[in-house]
């Protein structure tokens, strides 16, 4: 990404380092983000944290995209972004119900 996010779950290194510490995942530098198993584990953990913090999947997805601090600021200002979460959920439904 143009923001430096890496791997399947598009995690930024600073966020991933903090998540790795919380989950006791061995951090081996930024190359850790290119290990699909570790990247997905960290991304899933982070999304779960955002669901716990914001209370629903739509806000959690927006927090995952914008960052939790920025989303909180938006919400305090009365603005609730929805574009990213709509896009993710639309693609999830499309993929989820597609025959194999």
Language model features: what each stretch is:
Residues 1-100:
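Catalytic glycan-binding domains that act on GlcNAc-containing polysaccharides
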């Amino acid at each position: 990404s143009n923001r430096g996010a890496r791997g399947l779950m598009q995690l930024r290194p600073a966020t991933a380092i903090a998540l790795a510490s919380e989950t006791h995942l061995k951090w081996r530098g930024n190359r850790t983000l290119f290990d699909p198993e570790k990247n997905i584990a960290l991304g899933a953990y982070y999304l779960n944290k955002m669901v716990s913090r914001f209370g629903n999947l739509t806000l959690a997805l927006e927090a995952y995209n914008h960052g939790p601090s920025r989303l909180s600021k938006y919400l305090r200002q009365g603005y609730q972004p929805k574009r990213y979460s709509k896009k993710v959920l639309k693609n999830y439904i499309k993929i989820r119900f597609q025959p194999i």
